[in-house]
Structure formats: C-alpha cells, structure tokens
Amino acid sequence: MSEKKKVISVMIPTYNEEENARPIYEAVRDEIRKDCPDYDYEILFIDNKSQDRTRRIITDICAQDSKVKAIFNSKNFGQFNSPYYGMIHTTGDCTITICADFQDPVEMIPKFVAEWEKGYKIVIGKKTTSQENPVMYFLRDCYYKTIKKMSNVEMIEQFTGFGLYDKSFIQTLRDLHDPTPFLRGIVAELGPERKEIEYTQPKRRAGKTHNNWYSLFDAAMLSFTSYTKIGMRMAEFFGFFCAAVSFILGLVFLVAKLIHWNTFAAGYAPMIIAVFFVGGVQLTFLGFLGEYIMAMNARIMDRPLVVEEKRLNFEPETPESDTTRAQ
C-alpha cells in the first residue's frame, strides 16, 4: 500500500484580481506538479469582496478543479484579517501564503518545501531588492527599520508574510483568537525557529496595486500599537521636557522683566509660538493615544475575523465561518 502524500496548502488572498486570478492558479498548480511531484496540494482563494470579475473566475476554476477551494467574504475585512482567516482554514500539512499579483515568486515554493522537510516549522521569504517604485521601497525599508528598533519583539525586516507555515503553527494561529491579527508580528513573537530565504521582489504582473497611503498607514499603526510602547513613552517624556523648558523660560522672562521693568518688552510673539507648539504636540500625542484605544477597542469588541458570504469545494463537515470567532 502506497504511503499517503503530504498535502501542501497554498492560500491566495484576492481583491479585484481578475487579470491575475487564473494565471496565479495555473502558475502555482504547475510549479507544484513540476517541482514537488511527491506532494498532494490544495489551493484556497479567499476573496475580499472583489468588485470586478474575480469571483466569477474563481468560481469557474473551482468547478474545473476539485483541489481548489474558495471563501467569498461578505464585505472587505481588510488586508490583514482576510489572509489570516484564509490561513486558519487550510487543511494541509503546511500552508504557503502567496499574493495573487505575482510579487511573491511561485518559484520559491520548492525552496520553502525543501527547508520545511529539513525540520523548519516556518520558512519565510525576505526581500533583498524590489522592482517596485524605488521611493515606496525606500519608505518601506525605513518603516521596517523603525519598527524593529522600537518594538519589544525582534521584528523581521522586509517580510510581508510570504512564506511556508507548518500545520502546528497554523494551529497556534487558530488558538490565538485575535480579532486584529498582525501576522508579521505574530511570526516574530510566537513562531518557532525559522529559515529565511532571500529573494528579489518582481513587479506586479497586471492590474493596479490596492495599497494606498491610507492602507500603508493603517498597517504601520497596527504594528505600532500592537508591538511598541514608544508612542506612550514619547508622550510622557516629551510632555515632561516641554513642561521643564516652559518653566525655565518662564523664570527667565520673569527675572528679565523684574530687572528691566521699563525696558524689557516680551510681547505676544513668544506666547503665541509657545501655545501653537504645545497645542500641536498635544494633538499629535492625542492621536497616538487614540490609535492605542482603537486597537484595544477592536480586541474588546470580539468581532469575527471575517463573515463569509459563500464557500466552494469545502467538505460538509468544515466549520462555518460565523462560528469561527476571535474570542
């Protein structure tokens, strides 16, 4: 009797990827068949309420290939919740996350699997260079370095989530019940010994990126509030510093006025500058405080990671989404 093959799960999140959905499916399928012939596989698409033909294309793929599964979200649940939810609904011996836009090279799959077979529970791709906009790459690099210095956890530079995760770590993700998960931080904080494989990130194959300044800022704030205390510490120390400087300057002005009562004219300019400066500082740190409170509120509300609209090619005994809560 032949030994049962290990199963590689490939999770592909999509949002308005009508030009890439079928090509990424074919590329992943062909790569596994060619370079990982001793493994079985499943491909799971999780679609974040696409507004184009993506869902129709994925539905056609599922009808043609029983190894392909799909989860259609009832709305857009964001760039972190949806992929995380897809990961915890894979069933393979390992799960590989890969973007539909081809910026995560499918040629990395056999390299990931080879390192996994050596015993690594997590094998990740780490960008060394990128063919994307050099300004964006520079800003991302600054972000990674900044968050690494400020974080309580040793964060991973140039890591987007692209990688292979053993089923034991996938179970860890299921057990976390985090309603606002930040996978990159979770891997750094809770992941076992990992292998990092460097790669060059290619350009998006087709279509337009869905990351804008707001989504990038949202990602930065999630990592900032989840893994650093620096915002609150900065507010405390800077507030103390401003109070000390204001007290000293106040004494200087008072002494100068007492000594040169008739000739010293302080005027309103210093006062106005000081008021605007302190007001700006207060508003900045109130914003920081608000980010922390929003992060806490999201966790306290205990809402589901995702609410499903539909799923395709799942076995009947697979748990339904509305019972999968981030508790």
What spans do the regions from the language model cover?
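Structured catalytic core of nucleotide-sugar glycosyltransferases
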Residues: 1-133, 325
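Alpha-helical structural elements of signaling/regulatory helical domains
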Residues: 16, 38, 175-179, 229-233
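Short, flexible helix/strand-to-coil boundary loops that buttress conserved ligand/catalytic motifs
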Residues: 25, 174, 297
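Conserved amphipathic alpha-helical interaction elements at protein-protein interfaces in regulatory
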Residues: 30, 34, 60, 64, ...
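Conserved catalytic core of Hanks-type protein kinase domains
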Residues: 61, 89, 115, 149, ...
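Acceptor/aglycone-binding surface of glycosyltransferases and processive sugar-polymer synthases
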Residues: 73-75, 79-89, 94, 105-183, ...
